């Protein structure tokens, strides 16, 4: 009998091979896909439509930062602690009806960072600019002067990154289906002669932030999603804007699951 079911090509990436082997998760997932009645799933490493990522948030972030230009759907199965980018905590809990639902996928917002107008970086979570001593920036919003900041540094975060360092710095949490980004000041200097706004600012996704006249004494670090970027040249200016990834993340726009993760990770009841 001819198989008239639609075909979906997929692949599986496991970032913790020993854990995958111990759980037998790859075999369990492949078996689950084979038994699904509505679609024929075929593994295709060269050109998958769906990629199942087995790992923690760190592995997920690194993967997206490298593969964001590819038009592929990504489903996360959590092997870490928080699992903010994962839709499921185990193979057993995977709902294949949700996997094939186009409405369950969302193109995440990324930060596009340019340094000295020649070095370009992309981050799913956050850009951290930090110094153990005093650092100062002239900040412009859409090429209009905003303020001169003096303090330990600045954080720029996407909605999906707002529960990280930004939360620790008392920045706002933004739900993933809101297309904004945040600038949060880190330990700003405030006294009688000088003070900055000393409050997080939420920007629309089409805003562009420029940092110029960057001054610091000895050390100044630039971190893209936790990865320190080293520069041999002097940093004269930094520009931050956003782009939409071509890749789609499963469940990222599901506010009910997001609230459940917030409760599980941060909120304690009686």
From Swiss-Prot:
Its EC number is 2.7.1.23. The gene is nadK. GO terms for cellular component: cytoplasm. HAMAP family: NAD_kinase. GO terms for molecular function: ATP binding; metal ion binding; NAD binding; NAD+ kinase activity. Belongs to the NAD kinase family. InterPro entries: ATP-NAD_kinase_N, ATP-NAD_kinase_PpnK-typ_C, NAD/diacylglycerol_kinase_sf, NADK. This is NAD kinase. Involved in the regulation of the intracellular balance of NAD and NADP, and is a key enzyme in the biosynthesis of NADP. Catalyzes specifically the phosphorylation on 2'-hydroxyl of the adenosine moiety of NAD to yield NADP.
